[in-house]
Amino acid sequence: MRNINAVFLKQVKETLKNKSILIQFLMFPVMVIIMENAVKIDDMPEHFFVKLFAVMFVGMAPLTCMSSIISEEKEKNTLRALMMCNVKPLEYLVGIGAYVWLMCMAGSLLFAFCGDYSGADFFVFMLIMAIGILLSELTGAVIGIFCKNQMSATSVTVPVMMVFSFLPMLSTFNETIEKVAIITYSQQINILINGLGTTDIKPESLIIIAANFLVSAILFVIAFKKKGLE
């Protein structure tokens, strides 16, 4: 537990130094504040930008941050130094994961406030965001572990991130894309957020999210056993 706390605090201290990571945490929360207050269009669904950017935030920020942090520290041999200080690989990953998850959940609070969620809807919204963020973290960790350096991680992260963050938005305009996107967790997060307070949660959404989690967990185990953090 002490090592996990040390890794967590290390990342917190480096937040302001790592501008690319900081931008990921702040970009969509800042955008939603601006767009919700600056753009008013007739017949626009209530809190349209909150729902749109919340889903994009889930698909982009945690995934990008996890892959970037892991691959960067592998490249700089920071991980090797941590291993020599008796920090176990899983302790490192839990520490990094907790840091990214909490930072993203802080951003989720801004989405919740901008969306005027209250009572049960607030807690359900935060739960949906928490699950989506965790899934994206797993995916980002797989990429970070598999890739040798930050450049190769970025080349893999960008297309994967675009799939999970942009498919839900594109699916609203194209039925064919919607049929493809339906199997992704980010699209199910999109469905759950847009139906919050108006429709019941469908079992299909929970099954697809669970299936996505299982696939991500299996890939994580494979990546960790094959590559480790060396």
Q: Can you describe what each PLM-predicted range is?
A:
Residues 89, 97-147:
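Alpha-helical transmembrane segments and their short interhelical loops
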Residues 46-111:
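Hydrophobic alpha-helical transmembrane segments of multi-pass membrane transport proteins
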Residues 19, 131-167:
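A structural motif at transmembrane helix-loop-helix junctions in multipass membrane proteins
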Residues 1-21:
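N-terminal Sec/SRP start-transfer signal
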Residues 59-64, 94-95, 120-128, 173-176, ...:
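Short alpha-helical transmembrane interface motifs in multi-pass membrane proteins
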Residues 14-41, 49-65, 156-168, 207-217:
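Hydrophobic alpha-helical transmembrane segments of multi-pass membrane transport/permease proteins
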Residues 2-6, 172-207:
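Short hydrophobic, aromatic-rich alpha-helical segments embedded in or entering the lipid bilayer
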Residues 26, 35-37, 191-230:
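Alpha-helical transmembrane segments of multi-pass membrane transporters/translocases
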